[in-house]
Structures are given as C-alpha cells and as structure tokens.
Amino acid sequence: MEKKVFVVEGYAKKGSLKFRFKKYFIALKKEDAIFYTYSILGSNHKLKKTQIHIERVYELDPEKDKDKLPDKRLLAFF
C-alpha cells in the first residue's frame, strides 16, 4: 500500500469553548487519519470522542499541492 497525506478539518468543544482544527497526517487510508485525529486530540487536549466533530477529510497530492503542506519535511516520505 502507498502512503498518502490526509487533511482532517473540524472543531472540538471543551466546556463552553469551541475551537477549530486542521491536522495533517501521513496514513494508508482515510480511516487511519480519522483515528489519529481522535488519538492526538484526546491525548493532548483531554477530549472525548464525542467532543470532537470532524467536518471534512480529504487527500492531498504531495506533488501537486506542495504549497499547501504546512511542513516541507512531509515530502521526505514520498
């Protein structure tokens, strides 16, 4: 299988606060990127899965969308 760059966008609620997030992951499939999102936000911000709302998951092509990647070191995986 081939590794792909996925972008996960959404928002999370913690108490009365609501914050938006955009995470970039290298994963084999879309479901893995969603799982990593829950894992990272849960451990770093102490959020439950029900507090995290994923709005959009899409794949970036590292060759075409080089300017959209937040860190050029992601290209080292391809």
Curated annotation (Swiss-Prot):
One function term, GO molecular function aspect: structural constituent of ribosome
The keyword Lyase belongs to this UniProt entry's keyword annotation: no
Gene3D superfamilies: 3.10.20.10
Pfam families: Ribosomal_L18A (PF01775)
GO biological process annotation, one example: translation
Transmembrane feature ranges: none
Keywords tagged on the record: Ribonucleoprotein, Ribosomal protein, RNA-binding, rRNA-binding
Highest taxon, organism lineage: Archaea
Cellular compartments per GO CC: ribonucleoprotein complex; ribosome
InterPro entries: Ribosomal_eL20, Ribosomal_eL20_dom
Quaternary assembly: Part of the 50S ribosomal subunit. Binds 23S rRNA.
HAMAP family per record: Ribosomal_eL20
Protein family (similarity comment): Belongs to the eukaryotic ribosomal protein eL20 family.
Protein name: Large ribosomal subunit protein eL20
Native source organism of the sequence: Nanoarchaeum equitans (strain Kin4-M)
